[in-house]
């Protein structure tokens, strides 16, 4: 059976349980799968959060072979965000208010974009950059 084409971001958090709660409360993700360490339930080995068929994977930034070989760093370890995520939403202003109420650091308020649509940008509690907008880059031109 063919695999559905997808690019799935993987994020590392110092406090993954808190990040999962935040991403669900602030951005509307739902828990698809959460696998805590059987010996340390506050350590999330792997989690999958879903939003309208799109997936984000995350876990604690625990030391393991993959992290060492790939050089993966959290935002704090890197000294700042090294990438940002863009998520399409229908009601940008309502989404921003939900995110703000949950504690998101909104550094670009909702605004109309020159290239179309409306959007805003924020940081989650560990500094990952998220942008949300109504501009759909995959829509037919």
Residue spans for each PLM region:
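Conserved beta-strand-loop-alpha-helix junction that forms the acyl-donor binding cleft
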Residues: 13-15
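C-terminal catalytic core of tyrosine-transesterase DNA break-rejoin enzymes
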Residues: 126
